[in-house]
Regions:
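Catalytic cores of Mg2+-dependent Asp-rich isoprenoid enzymes
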Residues: 1-147, 152, 156-228
Length: 228
């Protein structure tokens, strides 16, 4: 399966924005995206998700892996000097999804969004070869914003997987999976919580877009498209 497939199929906005990037940069972004997507899919699509992701992480830690995507990712990690911290934080976030998820607060959902998406933004910034110290922070915020958007969009789908990302303190009661899936549940309460997530995301989108000026000029327009 071609690496470009992962962005074309799963990240449509970035795929089309990527057409404005240099081919080598877009190819490296595709490797990063494929690496992250495969790890995430191990959690979403398998009953033995914990053992699957642990095996993937072990493969990554090996000097040479049998997994082509892992080997290609490790090459770009060296090429762009991507810190291990972001990979380790990504793995930590993905492993959180191997068990039922119930987020308690706004602070907790932001932290979770950093682990699973802010880290990806930071790694993308390294591929874009930005040397400005503020660029990474803004890239992390853009990743968080995109994850919050995904959470707002996929509330019911996530609930069916046993995951409630809407913070419990957004409600006046203990929200359970059956409440979200049940059509008889007060949808106004649910929509109000989703609206809060969307409002939260806007602050992070603003920060992410403010960071575009720190990127090389050739990168700015594609990233603006991807974040729009």
């Amino acid at each position: 399966m071609k690496l470009e497939f992962y962005i074309k199929h799963y990240g449509k906005s970035f795929y089309w924005a990527g057409k404005f990037l240099k081919k080598d940069i877009f190819a490296d972004c595709s490797i990063l995206y494929a690496f992250c997507r495969i790890a995430d899919d191990l959690v979403d699509n398998n009953k033995n998700s914990k053992s699957k992701i642990n095996k993937f992480i072990k493969e990554y830690s090996n000097v040479k892996s049998k997994n082509i995507i892992i080997n290609q990712f490790k090459k770009i990690q060296i090429k762009y000097n991507i810190p291990n911290k972001f990979i380790n934080d990504l793995f930590y976030g993905i492993k959180l999804d191997t068990k039922p998820v119930k987020i308690k607060s706004k602070e907790e959902i932001i932290k979770y969004s950093y682990y699973v998406a802010g880290t990806v933004g930071a790694m993308m910034a390294h591929i874009f070869s930005t040397n400005h110290p503020k660029a990474i922070k803004h890239a992390i915020d853009l990743g968080i914003a995109m994850q919050l958007t995904n959470i707002a969009r996929d509330v019911v789908t996530d609930a069916k997987l046993g995951r409630i990302y809407l913070p419990q303190n957004f409600f006046r009661q203990n929200i359970k999976v059956k409440d979200i899936v049940n059509e008889n549940f007060d949808r106004n309460k649910l929509f109000a919580a989703i609206t809060k997530i969307i409002i939260m995301s806007e602050k992070f989108y603003k920060s992410g877009n403010n960071g575009i000026k720190y990127l090389p000029r050739a990168i700015r327009f594609p990233i603006f498209l991807a974040s729009s």
